[in-house]
Swiss-Prot record:
Gene name of this polypeptide: Ag2
Protein name: Uncharacterized protein C11orf96 homolog
Positions with biased composition (Low complexity): 232-242
Keywords per UniProt: Cytoplasm, Phosphoprotein
Ranges of Basic residues composition bias in the record: 157-172
Region described as Disordered: 16-121, 152-178, 215-242
PANTHER family attached to this UniProt entry: CHROMOSOME 11 OPEN READING FRAME 96, SI:CH1073-281M9.1
Sites of Phosphothreonine modification: T175
UniProt induction comment: Expression in the hippocampus is induced by long-lasting long-term potentiation.
Length: 242
């Protein structure tokens, strides 16, 4: 025990476990770090401050510049909604159209009922398909495709009963069971003599196949029963020595 204490003291030394590192004390080190941080913050503020312009003064655009430049800088999605005075097809193409000169209010008569009916008929195919007018303006080719290739109308479902179309029995899997409705239909329709002969022949063939299979199985059992098996498959003999 004394030897272990002496060895530990020799490892630790005279100064103990916590030796002081050489250099400046802690207080001066912290002060120096604070001063460095303050100097860095002042330099960053100076670098971020705006500098006065030294070059030639910037040229401002003259008012005579057309408004197309500002329109081109707009987001492309802004062209989806056309202005109120511009037609939708022109707005979707993006080509400017010269607007008609403003006329006096009394020069053009108000639209009659025939014009209103024509406008409603033009807007009907799109509305019937569930396409809004803005969709027609953005994607007119889809509306044209729908006009060229109309969707087929689904036939109305017939009520269950004699009016229902019965699928042919030959196209069905043989393993699928026959329903009672089909049996009743056959009984009501009646069977021709040729079909009855075919049904009798198929029934006799199936009976003959069944008789042959049972006969072959009985013939196989006889030699198996006559000879004695050396290794029994019974679970009670599994522990016995062979």
């Amino acid at each position: 025990m004394a030897f272990a204490v002496i060895r530990a003291c020799s490892r630790v030394g005279r100064g103990g476990l916590y030796k002081r590192l050489g250099g400046l004390p802690r207080g001066t080190r912290r002060q120096r770090q604070r001063r460095q941080g303050a100097s860095l913050s002042t330099t960053e503020q100076r670098s971020l401050a705006p500098r006065p312009p030294t070059g030639p003064p910037a040229r401002y655009p003259s008012p005579a510049v057309p408004a197309r430049a500002s329109e081109a800088r707009r987001h492309p999605a802004a062209d989806l909604d056309p202005p109120p005075g511009e037609p939708q097809a022109v707005a979707s193409r993006g080509t400017p159209e010269p607007r008609p000169p403003p006329e006096s209010p009394g020069a053009q008569p108000p639209p009659g009922p025939a014009a209103a009916d024509g406008a409603m008929a033009a807007a009907k195919p799109g509305e019937l398909m569930g396409i809004s007018s803005s969709y027609q303006a953005v994607m007119p080719h889809f509306v044209c495709l729908a006009d060229e290739f109309p969707q087929p109308v689904r036939p109305a479902k017939l009520p269950k009963g004699k009016g229902r179309l019965r699928r042919p029995r030959q196209s069905r899997f043989k393993t699928q069971p026959v329903t009672f409705d089909e049996i009743q239909e056959v009984e009501e329709e009646g069977v021709s003599p040729m079909e009855e002969e075919k049904a009798k022949k198929s029934f006799l063939q199936s009976l003959e196949c069944l008789r042959r299979s049972t006969q072959s199985l009985s013939l196989q059992r006889e030699p198996l029963g006559s000879c004695k098996l050396r290794n029994s498959l019974d679970s009670s003999d599994s522990d016995s020595a062979l």
